C-alpha cells in the first residue's frame, strides 16, 4: 500500500526557516517524481515544487522560487522541503503528492502539515454564543452557533455537548484575520421544540494556549424593552465562495475550438440555493452565458457553474471579463475579474532532446521537449508519431525564468523498440506569439546511432 507520511511544520516567525519531510513506503521511491502542494486558509490548492525522480530537474512556483529548496534522499525514501525567509503568506497546510502511474493527477497524498508564519504570540480564543430570538424559531428547526474569535495559532477544536451531539453540526474553516489572529464558527441545527428543554453547550479546546471553554447557547427573549445583540458578520459564519477560471490555452489558439471563461460558486446552502450571475466584458454587461444546473456536494452544499463563451481575439487582445455573483447568503455581491496576462508576447523556442545513452539500457526511454523564452505562460504542448497522438507524456507547469519569460519541459515515454525502429516523434507547441499560433519539432534515431 502506497503511503506518504509527513513530519515537520509548526509555528515560526517571519524570516525564519523550517524543513518538512515526506517519508514514502509501498513503492520504489527512486522511480517516482513527487511534488509539494499547499493550501492557504480559505484558498484553493497551490502547486509549490517538484523534483524529478533522478534529481536532475527541480521546478518551483514563482511565489517560493529562491526561498524554498526541494531535495530527496533515496536511501531513506524521503522527500524534503527546506523553506527559508518565510513570509506570513506562506502560512498553509503543505502536502506531498505522487502522480498516478498512468494519469496526470495526484493519486497519493501525505496527511498534510500545517505551517504557520506569524509574529503573533500564543493567544487563547474568546467564545461567543450565537442564538436566534425566541420569536424566530417557529419553522421547525433552529440554528445555534458558536463564534470562536481571536486565537493563535491553529488549530482549535469545537464539539457540542462534549461530543454527544454530532448530527446537524457544521464547523466552518478558520479565517485568518488582518490582525494575524484566527476566527471560526460552528453551527448546529436542532428542533425548535427542544429549545428550553434541552441544553446545548459549545465546547472549545485550544491546546496551544491550554484554553478550554464551555459556552451554553440558548435563544434570547426579545421584546420592546430588550434589544437583541447584533448578528455577527456573515463572513465569519461562512458562505459561498467564487472562483473564476480562464479558458484553456489550446481553446484560445485554435479557431476550431471554443474558449470559455468559467465562474464557479461553491458552498451554496440549501436555505439560499438561488445564485444569480452577471457577466461583463470590459465593463459592458453581456447575456450569452450559460448557467449549468446546480450540483449537490458531499458536504451538503451546492456547486453552481456559469460559463461564458468568449471570442478568440477578444481574449488574446486582453479584454477583461468580470463575473458578478449574487446570493441571499452574501452581504453584498462578489465580483471576480480575469484577463490574459499583460505584456509583450514572446515567441517560444523549441528544442527536442533524444534519450541519453545510459537510458538505452532500459525497456522504455524518454524523449524530451524543451520550450523556453515564451510569454505569457499560456501554452499547450502535445506529442504525436506518424500523425497519431501520443498520450504517455507529462509536461511541467511553466516556470518563470530570470529574464521574465517562461520555460517548461515535456517528457514522452516510449518503448525502446519503437525508438530503435526509427519512428519519428514530434513535439507540437501552441502559443499566441508563434506564426499561426503553432510550431512542431521532430526527432528520431539517426542511422548508425
UniProtKB/Swiss-Prot annotation:
Modified residues (Pyrrolidone carboxylic acid): 1
Organism: Homo sapiens (Human)
Ranges where the Ig-like domain occurs: 1-96, 125-218, 240-339, 348-444
Parts of the chain that traverse the membrane: none
Chief place of localization: secreted
GO biological processes: adaptive immune response
The entry's keywords: Adaptive immunity, Cell membrane, Disulfide bond, Glycoprotein, Immunity, Immunoglobulin, Immunoglobulin domain, Membrane, Pyrrolidone carboxylic acid, Repeat, Secreted
Annotated effect of mutating residue 436 to A: Impaired ability to activate the classical complement pathway
InterPro entries: Ig-like_dom, Ig-like_dom_sf, Ig-like_fold, Ig/MHC_CS, Ig_C1-set, Ig_sub, Ig_V-set, Immune_Resp_Modulators
Keyword Plastid: no
Carbohydrate attachment residues: 73, 299
Region of interest (Constant (C) domain), ranges: 120-449
GO CC annotations, alphabetized: extracellular region; immunoglobulin complex; plasma membrane
Protein name per its UniProtKB record: Immunoglobulin gamma-1 heavy chain
Compartments (UniProt record): Secreted; Cell membrane
One Pfam family cited in the UniProt record for this chain: V-set
Keyword Glycoprotein: yes
Effect of residue 324 to A: Impaired ability to activate the classical complement pathway
Region (Variable (V) domain, involved in antigen recognition) residue spans: 1-119
Disulphide-bridged cysteine pairs: 22-96, 146-202, 263-323, 369-427
Record text on subunit structure and interactions: Immunoglobulins are composed of two identical heavy chains and two identical light chains; disulfide-linked.
Family matches, as PROSITE patterns: IG_LIKE, IG_MHC
